[in-house]
């Protein structure tokens, strides 16, 4: 077999294949890490596919177990570039949420949470901020009657709105509101 120079067409094809292959091999940086810290929830939302309830069939994930995961992430990634999002169930069901948040923050990870706001009080919000809370997402699924129907609790709209107001009053605090659009909203 004779070594003939590759044609321009073949060289271009090989270069394209090499670049595509290199792109496939590049590591995609981790940007967000979700921690479902509990399966317990204080509401019974009609749209939720979770089997969360006030008393879960499984215990909450121990904080130490999640911190080990963060240690392994920090070994290969800059923690300041990975945002930890605490979800559930309802994260505010955890009595040690502030302790968990502080431990996450102390490891260099910014963190936020997704909440229905039912258990958010001014004092709890202050403690969460002191624990390094960067952001929060609050669920609000329509006006009072629709939201309360969707969430299965007559106080859920009022408490969610109060949580949103607290967050809006905090200078520089970043939060958002998510809505599950349905035929009642």
Language-model segments: what does each one mean?
Residues 163-185:
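Conserved strand-turn element in the central/C-terminal portion of the radical SAM core barrel
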Residues 81-85, 140, 176-179:
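Short beta-strands and strand-loop turn motifs
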Residues 91-93, 117-122, 138-154, 183-184:
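Conserved radical SAM core fold
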Residues 38, 148, 161-164:
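Residues within alpha-helical segments
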Residues 2-135:
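Conserved alpha-helical substructure of the radical SAM core
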């Amino acid at each position: 077999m004779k070594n003939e120079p590759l044609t321009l067409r073949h060289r271009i094809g090989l270069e394209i294949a090499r670049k595509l292959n290199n792109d496939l091999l590049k590591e995609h940086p981790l940007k967000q890490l979700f921690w479902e810290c509990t399966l317990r929830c204080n509401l019974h939302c009609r749209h939720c596919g979770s089997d969360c309830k006030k008393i879960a069939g499984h215990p909450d994930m121990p904080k130490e177990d999640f911190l080990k995961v963060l240690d392994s992430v920090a070994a290969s990634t800059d923690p300041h570039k990975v945002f930890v999002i605490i979800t559930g169930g309802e994260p505010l069901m955890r009595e040690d949420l502030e302790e968990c948040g502080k431990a996450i923050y102390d490891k260099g990870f910014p963190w936020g949470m997704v909440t229905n706001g039912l258990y958010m009080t001014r004092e709890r919000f202050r403690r969460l901020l002191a624990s390094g809370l960067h952001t929060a997402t609050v669920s609000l699924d329509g006006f009072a009657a629709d939201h309360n129907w969707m969430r299965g609790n007559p106080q859920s709209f009022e408490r969610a709105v109060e949580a949103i107001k607290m967050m809006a009053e905090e200078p520089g605090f970043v939060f958002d509101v998510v809505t599950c659009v349905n035929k009642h909203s």
